[in-house]
């Protein structure tokens, strides 16, 4: 799971970018030992803000970040919606 500082930074950035929801998925959400990245899915990010948000997450969190936009429907985003752990919204 996320450490306290990373979680707070995600919450701060979610508010800054007026996100509707943030889900944690992947190994960090499953609480696997030794996870090496943070997989996040966001809903409500404006298309022109996606890469700014991604850059801030990459520079401010303690681990590398993978970010997906839930507004792009696919089997994968549906699975993330079903199995992701809500951390904002």
Question: Can you name each region flagged by the protein language model?
Answer:
Residues 1-23, 29-35, 43-89:
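Catalytic core of pol beta-like nucleotidyltransferases
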């Amino acid at each position: 799971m996320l450490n306290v500082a990373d979680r707070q930074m995600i919450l701060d950035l979610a508010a800054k970018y007026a996100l509707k929801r943030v889900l944690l998925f992947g190994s960090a959400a499953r609480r696997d030992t030794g996870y090496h990245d943070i997989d996040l899915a966001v809903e409500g990010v404006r298309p022109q803000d996606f890469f700014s948000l991604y850059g801030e997450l990459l520079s401010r969190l303690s681990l590398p970040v993978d970010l997906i936009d839930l507004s792009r429907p696919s089997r994968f985003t549906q699975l993330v919606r079903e199995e992701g752990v809500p951390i904002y919204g």
